[in-house]
Design a protein with these regions (language model features):
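A short beta-loop-alpha structural element at the N-terminal edge
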Residues: 2-16, 20
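Active-site rim helix/loop that mediates acceptor-substrate recognition in acyltransferases
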Residues: 34-56
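Conserved beta-hairpin
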Residues: 49-69
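Conserved acyl-donor/pantetheine-binding loop and adjacent beta-alpha core of acyl/acetyltransferases
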Residues: 66-125, 131, 181-182
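Conserved GNAT acetyl-CoA-binding A-motif
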Residues: 117-119, 146-159
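Conserved acetyl-CoA-binding loop-helix of GNAT-fold acetyltransferases
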Residues: 126, 132-145, 169
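Conserved active-site alpha-helix within GNAT-family acetyltransferase domains
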Residues: 137, 149-151, 160-177, 183-184
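C-terminal "cap" of GNAT-fold acetyltransferases
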Residues: 152, 156-161, 180-205
Length: 205
């Protein structure tokens, strides 16, 4: 997998991939049901700007697939970005829509494990034009190799049950489930214990 760390110079590319990848997602298509494309793009750009504070936003060379990780001890948004996110929600979604989005985010926060340090897979998406080639899972597998080298655990939420078995094949196990408000979809949470790097092959004399 030919992957690299994304920078702010890649923001346009990674934001487009994430926006299109999650356009039909059971959770986020419901939460962002009302804004126009520019409004949705603004949400994702702000979220990615928060993640790009860390060197853990990964992309294939042309941005066909993107993974967004928050490292141990990190936050998805700075306090200033959180305030901007709330203002954007109210202006784009209205009071009711912003309240629903806030309730959705609270569900994710409440379910998030606290205790053992871990890498958090906030987002993983493939541009619709490049789906069906395993790029997202290949990028995730490459990332996990780096996380294993640190002996660290990993956590994710699966908003699409079609992906659960794919995550399990990469070592994630069921952690829990929660329902989103207003009869929303079920979100599965998954945990992958720290493993350590693969041992080097033994060379015999």
């Amino acid at each position: 997998m030919d992957a690299r760390v994304a920078t702010l110079a890649d923001l346009d590319v990674v934001a487009e991939t994430i926006q299109l990848a999650f356009a039909d997602d059971p959770v986020w298509s419901r939460a962002f049901a009302h804004p126009d494309d520019r409004g949705v793009a603004a949400f994702w750009r702000l979220w990615l700007e928060g993640a790009l504070r860390y060197p853990w936003v990964w992309m294939t060379q042309a941005g066909e697939a993107v993974s967004v990780w928050i490292p141990p001890g990190g936050d998805e948004l700075s306090p200033e970005q959180e305030a901007a996110f709330k203002r954007l929600a109210e202006s784009s979604l209205g009071r009711r829509g912003a309240s629903y989005l806030d309730a959705v985010m609270a569900c994710f926060t409440e379910a998030h494990p606290h205790g053992e340090p871990h890498y958090y897979l906030s987002l993983l998406g493939t541009h619709p034009a490049h789906r069906g080639h395993g790029l997202g899972m290949a990028l995730l597998a490459e990332n996990l190799t780096r996380i294993d080298a640190e002996g660290a655990a990993a956590y994710l939420e699966s908003s699409n049950s079609a992906n659960d078995q794919r995550y399990q094949r990469l070592g994630f196990a069921l952690h829990g489930r929660f329902n989103l408000p207003d009869d929303g979809p079920i979100v599965t949470t998954m945990w992958r214990p720290g493993r350590g790097p693969e041992p080097s092959p033994i060379r015999r004399p």
